[in-house]
């Protein structure tokens, strides 16, 4: 009896071990969700089909939509109007730096009440203020000198008409004043060119540039080329099918002849 009980206990132990091993194996083999280690970074993947600006890498919206100003494709196809305007002002170029397509632009000036000041350094501002002050003083002196000269000349002409002779000091003063006046005019012309350049800079700074989309004709041409290529491929496939059909018919004819001969 004791030996029977010992045999039963040993069998139960072996069965328990095998059951536990099978359960462990099933646990190990079952597909469970494995938690990723915390050291792996979690990145949000955005779909590649989203259109973004090639300058600021942001998407377009209702306030600032994306435009297609040139022939660039892929991720360089779209750009914001404001980003492109700022780039054109800073680079002073009118064409794409990649495909060399000249932008179709429409420029408009802002209203005078919305004009902004030029961004100049302190030294440039001091130079402009000094030159303006000097020119105002110079113009005042020239106008006063002309007035005095004309007044004295009129008196000397009256005296010369009475005497019939104009003295040399009159002609000397006239020549000196004419030379000085001519030099002043040349100097004013050079300085006025500087003022004109400043005025052009101010106008360019306060203009609004609207860049239009690339014309659809170019896109149509590209589309037409692809359409022309596709029918050629289809025609080649049709010709291949036709040749295969003719070959099959060619090989079936001898079979018909053989069948006819057998009947005879």
Curated annotation (Swiss-Prot):
Biased composition (Polar residues): 17-47
Positions bound to Zn(2+) 2: 70, 72, 96, 99
GO MF annotation terms: ubiquitin-protein transferase activity; zinc ion binding
Pfam families assigned: RINGv (PF12906)
SUPFAM superfamilies: RING/U-box
Binding site for Zn(2+) 1: 53, 56, 80, 83
Protein topology in the membrane: Multi-pass membrane protein
Transmembrane segments annotated in the record for this chain: 130-150, 170-190
Gene Ontology BP, a term: protein ubiquitination
Zinc finger motifs (RING-CH-type), residue ranges: 45-106
Group of enzyme by EC: transferase
UniProt-listed SMART domains: RINGv
Protein name in UniProt: E3 ubiquitin-protein ligase MARCHF8
Its biological purpose: E3 ubiquitin-protein ligase that mediates ubiquitination of cd86 and MHC class II proteins, such as hla-dr alpha and beta, and promotes their subsequent endocytosis and sorting to lysosomes via multivesicular bodies.
InterPro entries, per the entry: Znf_RING, Znf_RING-CH, Znf_RING/FYVE/PHD
């Amino acid at each position: 009896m004791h030996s029977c009980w010992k045999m039963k206990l040993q069998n139960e132990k072996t069965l328990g071990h095998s059951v536990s091993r099978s359960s462990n194996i099933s646990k190990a083999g079952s597909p469970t969700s494995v938690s990723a280690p915390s050291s792996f970074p979690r990145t949000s993947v955005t779909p590649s089909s989203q259109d973004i600006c090639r300058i600021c890498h942001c998407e377009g919206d209702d306030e600032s939509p994306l435009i297609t100003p040139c022939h660039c494709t892929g991720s360089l196809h779209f750009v914001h109007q404001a980003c492109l305007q700022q780039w054109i002002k800073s680079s002073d170029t009118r064409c794409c730096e990649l495909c060399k397509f000249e932008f179709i632009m429409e420029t408009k000036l802002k209203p005078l009440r919305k004009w902004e000041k030029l961004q100049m350094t302190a030294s440039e501002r001091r130079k402009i203020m000094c030159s303006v002050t000097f020119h105002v003083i110079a113009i005042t002196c020239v106008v006063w000198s002309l007035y005095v000269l004309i007044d004295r000349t009129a008196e000397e002409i009256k005296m010369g008409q009475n005497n019939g002779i104009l003295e040399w000091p009159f002609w000397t003063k006239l020549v000196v004043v004419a030379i000085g006046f001519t030099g002043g005019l040349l100097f004013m012309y050079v300085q006025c060119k500087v003022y004109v350049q400043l005025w052009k800079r101010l106008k360019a700074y306060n203009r609004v540039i609207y860049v239009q989309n690339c014309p659809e004709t170019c896109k149509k041409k590209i589309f037409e080329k692809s359409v022309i290529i596709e029918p050629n491929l289809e025609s080649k496939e049709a010709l291949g099918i036709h040749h295969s059909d003719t070959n099959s018919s060619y090989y079936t004819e001898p079979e018909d002849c053989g069948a006819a001969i057998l009947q005879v």
